[in-house]
Amino acid sequence: SEVGTGYHQTVYSNQNSDWGSQKELIEFINRMHAANTKVVADIVINHAGGKSWCEFFPQNFGEYGTFEPDASWIAQSDEVNSNPEAGDCKGKATGPEDGGYNMQDNYASARDWAHAKPEVQEMMKAYLKWMKNVIGFDGWRYDYAQGFKGKYIDMYNSASENYFSVVEFWNGDMNNIKSYLNDVNWNTLAFDFSTKYSAIQGIADGDYTKCKGSGLLGAGLSKFAVTFVDSHDTYFGCQGGRDNNDEIGGCGKSMEDYNKDRVLGANAFILSMPGVPCVFYPHWAKYKDAIGKMVLARKAAGVHSESQVSDEAGNGFYKATITGHHGSVRLLLGPNSGFNNIPQGYKLAYKGGNFAMYYTSTQAEVPVLSI
């Protein structure tokens, strides 16, 4: 991004930002790679920024191509064509649409790219190839994926040959997420908002029955699920003036000490279950010791994205055994789960005020957590 943090992108081929220079970014990625760590970029390709509705910038991706976008690259249903503040730009967005634009909600704060236009497709493919092969990123977190058709995610991933991608398709209905994944030809993972709004909310409310069969995990699609407790959007939802109150424990309250068991119990859930768990950094920063022990237990047991789960739930409890490559994890959530009783043959990973995570492992060497 030319300025700021990169959400309202103007020059995709300029990775200087408020966080540092492009040179510093490349150096950082190289250090992460030296530590055997993959690096994922937050990709904003739904919409374009600018100081005016008509402002566009050339995009220079070196060997991958140069591009000169203009208003004809913006979807014709974009608000630029109807907004009275658009001035001379009004009516100039003529980009083709194919039913992908505005699938769920128009992004009103910026102009939306017409991904049905071949020139836009070529620019985005060049951008991702450049980000991977020149800047050094390994994968993508696609922002606001509901703004364009899933087939373009498949197109862009196939072109860039990235190691990993996850889409932010913000929808609490598992069937809608599944439908989007099908549109992507199953060539990505998705943030599992359906598990966030069922199991994670159930843990916060003390309704542990919602943990059983929740979201993509319960639908047998854990391989495609990136599970999470909170994100920058849910955590800052009401603080940022948004109308959601999705933060675990209530808006602005998850980091309060009285919500510790809610936060850690929910993290124990995602770190025990199949799928690809994503720990929210503020949770990690505050509870590093506890969450670190859970991560090590998962690694020791060899729990993976397609691990099998045997579970039961009822009034005040959720009990699950998750089978890994090297052992298993036993998760006991809720006051009636018997969490204080160590299962035979298991070791304690971490115990809170109303939950515990235990594990077994056949590994000779104990996994080491390096952050």
Can you annotate each of these PLM segments?
Residues 2-7, 13, 29-37, 41, ...:
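Active-site-proximal helices and loops of the catalytic beta/alpha 8
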Residues 15-18, 117-119, 255-257:
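Short, flexible loop segments at the rims of nucleotide/cofactor-binding pockets, characterized by
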Residues 1-107, 113, 146-167, 172:
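Acidic/aromatic-lined carbohydrate-recognition and catalytic surfaces
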Residues 20, 119-123, 262:
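Short secondary-structure boundary/capping elements
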